[in-house]
Amino acid sequence: AIRKAITIATGLHCEAILLYAVRLGSGPKLEYGSQETWDRFSAALREVIPMAAQAKVRLNPENVWNKFLLSPLEMRAFVDQFHSPWLQTHFDVGNVMQYGYPEDWILTLGSRIQRVHFKDYKLSNRGVAGQFVDLLQGDVNWKGVMDALVKVRYNGFLSPEIDHDPAQPDQLKVVSASLDKILSMS
């Protein structure tokens, strides 16, 4: 699947592919252990890094809710094991809010960050799950995020990850205005 994605990305002149490992499990049932997932994902990536390098397409694992690479130290170690500029990371700001701090992830990952998703997350009271919300409506410390991105000299794409609602025709205007506010915080 990754080889096919590289081929498609090359045809589209796409410079990067977002990737993530299989989920460790579903609900309370463990399907793959952390070490097995690490080993299998690492092996799969080692096989395709030469193809990605030849195609000039970066492979960027993203921090997603799959119960794998749950800290910036784990993500950094995972990326660093390859010693390749063709494997970096796609960082999602909102995805870490349940178990970490985006600004800490940014400072820890530094130059390994190739792409960034902007998404907000509202933490809830104890025992109640949080939820993804519109930009600037959650608990992300956007000033801290922007300061961290500046500190690590990030100059790549910042793309909002939003749920499109056709019933709200002005939604993209609101997202654009929110992005302008966030970007002005640096």
Describe the predicted segments one by one.
Residues 1-89, 98:
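Active-site acidic/histidine proton-transfer and metal-coordination neighborhood
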